[in-house]
Amino acid sequence: MPTIQQLVRKGREDKVVKTKTPALKGSPQRRGVCTRVYTTTPKKPNSALRKVARVKLTSGIEVTAYIPGVGHNLQEHSMVLVRGGRVKDLPGVRYKIVRGSLDTQGVKNRKQARSRYGAKKEKS
């Protein structure tokens, strides 16, 4: 434990908090343009074809973003909204595309957790 004199001389050093989403530059979301839409395989022990897109953000940084939900309408030059949030079994994927905003359509026939996937309430 330091003495008061040592604290007067040096002071306490603040902990450096490292951001998990540097490409968003402090924003909650960023707009971007898809440069490539493709599928990739997750790391062991999982097996699938995960849908991802390379997105050039308005902050000038190009990132890999995951496309959540079943089916999508994205292609090259689509305008998308990107939020933070990693995909645990895809190394290097630290962002997700927001469904139901800009050029991205919501998930069809979605009954539960609709707001996460941009799905409208079904007419009963």
Swiss-Prot record:
Gene3D superfamilies: Nucleic acid-binding proteins. One of its GO terms (molecular function) is rRNA binding. GO terms for biological process: translation. With S4 and S5 plays an important role in translational accuracy. Interacts with and stabilizes bases of the 16S rRNA that are involved in tRNA selection in the A site and with the mRNA backbone. Located at the interface of the 30S and 50S subunits, it traverses the body of the 30S subunit contacting proteins on the other side and probably holding the rRNA structure together. The combined cluster of proteins S8, S12 and S17 appears to hold together the shoulder and platform of the 30S subunit. This is Small ribosomal subunit protein uS12. One of its GO terms (cellular component) is small ribosomal subunit. Keywords: Methylation, Ribonucleoprotein, Ribosomal protein, RNA-binding, rRNA-binding, tRNA-binding. Part of the 30S ribosomal subunit. Contacts proteins S8 and S17. May interact with IF1 in the 30S initiation complex. The gene is rpsL. Residues 108-118 have a biased composition (Basic residues). InterPro entries: NA-bd_OB-fold, Ribosomal_uS12, Ribosomal_uS12_bac. The modification 3-methylthioaspartic acid is found at D89. It comes from Kineococcus radiotolerans (strain ATCC BAA-149 / DSM 14245 / SRS30216).
